[in-house]
Amino acid sequence: MSDFFHSDVLSVSELNAFAKSLLENHLAGLWIAGEVSNLTRAASGHYYFSLKDSRAQVRCAMFKGAAVRLAKPLKEGDHIEVSGKISIYEARGEFQITVNEVRLKGLGQLYEAYERLKAQLQAEGAFAAERKKPLPVRPQCIGIVTSLAAAALRDVVTTLKRRAPEIPVIVYPTPVQGAGSELQIAQAIKTASQRAECDVLIVCRGGGSIEDLWAFNEEPVVRAIESCTVPVVSGVGHETDFTLADFVADMRAPTPTGAAELVSPNRQESLHRLAQAQCRLKTVLEQRYFDASQKLDWLARQIRHPRQKLDEQRASIGKLAQTLSYSMTQNVRTHTARFERQTQALKHCRPDVSVCKKNIDRFQTALSHAFHQLLTHRRQSLTAQAALLEAVSPQHILERGFSVVKNTRGQVIRNADVLKQGQKLHIIFADGETDVRVSKEQGQQDLFDCI
């Protein structure tokens, strides 16, 4: 001690400094448990409180840098465990703890593991709303994962029978607390997912201490819910109890009974909604029928309207035709009367017109007679010339037994002197044609061979 102090008599400051050194050097790294009292939170974000038990208390200060790491704010009466620098505030000689870390009393490593797993799941997006599966509106089968001895099972089954007795229920039994229960709960969830017998799955248990509910904070249960192909509704504990299973489930209910109400349609509500739907459907159908009738009437009027127009146009055309006929008749009568008047006037002016007309008629008759005689003579002459031409026509000559012989260039062969043995010829008869070849010399019989 003499090495630390200058004399055996200590000053107050020396005493406090010595005590501070001892505390900081020998009590580092300890966890101290107690109840929060006299809690004050400064505007700066610092916490000042006393940590007490039944026989003593110690002043604590937790500065903002450490306070921001709290999972939730401190409150009066919290039972916690703190770790930090145990020391003395020298100016007043007050014993205090400068707190660096806080955890709930009794949870220790479990709570720390809880926070780590929660942070990991949060980072993985396991709590994200977009990964939540929607619950079926009217499930055909409901599954329940819980203990057969649990009061929660009776509550859920009673609620389902009351609200939707027609929906079958399948129970996947498992212990819900105790050593190894988390593995059995996870296996029951996996079994329900693999069998795919139900449309929605309730994972539930009744209320209890945090230790009783802890299995639903374990990673096997959380991962089983996350990977389940069936929508999962959690109903663990009471409304104020939250577990990691609640965060990762597709829907969280405050209680097991609440979970049953979430997954089951209420019979009375369903009947009421059905009646409302029928009423709305009837209204819609009546309105559509009325609209269709109105449209049909309008279309019928539109169909009659063109017929009326056609009738009107037909009547108008008839009137116009009558007017035109009357006008033409009047014009003809007028011009006829005018022509007759002019004819009579012309007769009076030229008395010899009638004589000239008679001469013209006589001349016309004589001209017509002479034309017919000339036409008859011309026809007779044409017939005689046609007969003469027919008599001397090549075809007529051929019909009398003659033929025409041509070489390959189409030239007519008039005598046999020009023919050569083997020469090709073309012969035309009255009833056909053929090709031949000269086979013998001139003067021999059978001069030609047919090809």
Curated annotation (Swiss-Prot):
Gene3D superfamilies linked to this entry: 2.40.50.1010
Annotated signal sequence is none
Q: State the PANTHER family in the record.
A: EXODEOXYRIBONUCLEASE 7 LARGE SUBUNIT
**A Gene Ontology cellular-component term:** cytoplasm
Q: Where in the cell is it found?
A: Cytoplasm
Q: What is the lineage of its organism?
A: Bacteria, Pseudomonadati, Pseudomonadota, Betaproteobacteria, Neisseriales
**Any idea which UniProt keywords this protein has?**
Cytoplasm, Exonuclease, Hydrolase, Nuclease
Q: Which domain of life is it from?
A: Bacteria
One family from Pfam that matches here is tRNA_anti_2
- Identify the InterPro entries for this entry: Exonuc_VII_L (IPR003753), Exonuc_VII_lsu_C (IPR020579), OB-fold_nuc-bd_dom (IPR025824)
Q: Which family does it belong to?
A: Belongs to the XseA family.
General function of this protein:
Bidirectionally degrades single-stranded DNA into large acid-insoluble oligonucleotides, which are then degraded further into small acid-soluble oligonucleotides.
Record protein name field:
Exodeoxyribonuclease 7 large subunit
User: Which organism is this entry from?
Assistant: Neisseria meningitidis serogroup B (strain ATCC BAA-335 / MC58)
